[in-house]
Amino acid sequence: MKQYLELCQRIIDEGTWVENSRTGKRCLTVINADLVYHVDKNEFPLITTRKSFWKAAIAEMLGYIRGYDNAADFRNIGAKTWDANANDNQAWLNNPHRKGADDMGRVYGVQGRGWSKPDGGSIDQLRKIVDNLSKGIDDRGEILSFYNPGEFHMGCLRPCMHTHNFSLLGDTLHLTSFQRSCDVPLGLNFNQVQVFTLLALIAQITGHKAGTAYHKIVNAHIYEDQLELMQSVQLKRSPFPSPQLSINPDIKSLEDLETWVTMDDFEVTGYEHHEGIRYPFSV
């Protein structure tokens, strides 16, 4: 929690105003932010200086794991995060590759589970990672990438958190996640929860102990219409201790994650928080 607040304060103190062409808004921006999550100690990085909703974040990651390409599928498992980008983004609405309502195109999990090859085949990156790690193999390339510039035109949004690199040291699994851009007041808590949970899940289904998750952000920003709430409300509050995340121990394989797992298989305990803050969202 401390590192989140320190990043927010750093953006305010050191940030540069940048005009964002996609949203038409200015962002106060810094380059390079590093966050660390101690999954081994179960210090779940859920923001406590405002009420945060962790279930949608985990549901979204579950949708990525399953390779979903439709906002309706995400809604069905508890995440409404793709509704706007799939249905309210004018550039995507005008895109000939859009298949209809709720279609997201070839984004995120589609790339992770079915990266297109020049010969017409596809690569299931996540399956390869899980298979290797389950055998105790780390080939120094256990990398899950959603970033495919050759197909950006076929999706509603380029990936923000685009790469997850797993590393196995002995019987302990670590994760380094890379993010090109982050809306810190709104998006970062989602991303923190997802990085933490992804390491916890992959460690569990491959039979390893979860270690440390490293989260690297390139462009960290606060939109101009979010700044006042951040300065006058959230940064004035004192954080509470981190809560803990429990995952159903019956989840033992990638197939389990693909088929029967729901949000009922996750539980957060010890979550104390301040009142919610309604930050503006930029599509």
Swiss-Prot record:
InterPro entries hit by this protein: Thymidate_synth/dCMP_Mease (IPR045097), Thymidate_synth/dCMP_Mease_dom (IPR023451), Thymidate_synth/dCMP_Mease_sf (IPR036926), Thymidylate_synthase (IPR000398)
Binding residue positions for dUMP: R22, R180, S181, C182, D183, N191, H221, I222, Y223
The reaction(s) this protein catalyses: dUMP + (6R)-5,10-methylene-5,6,7,8-tetrahydrofolate = 7,8-dihydrofolate + dTMP
Cellular localization per UniProt: Cytoplasm
Signal peptide: none
Pathway: Pyrimidine metabolism; dTTP biosynthesis
GO BP term (any one): methylation
Keyword set includes Transferase: yes
Protein name (Swiss-Prot/TrEMBL): Thymidylate synthase
Gene encoding the protein: thyA
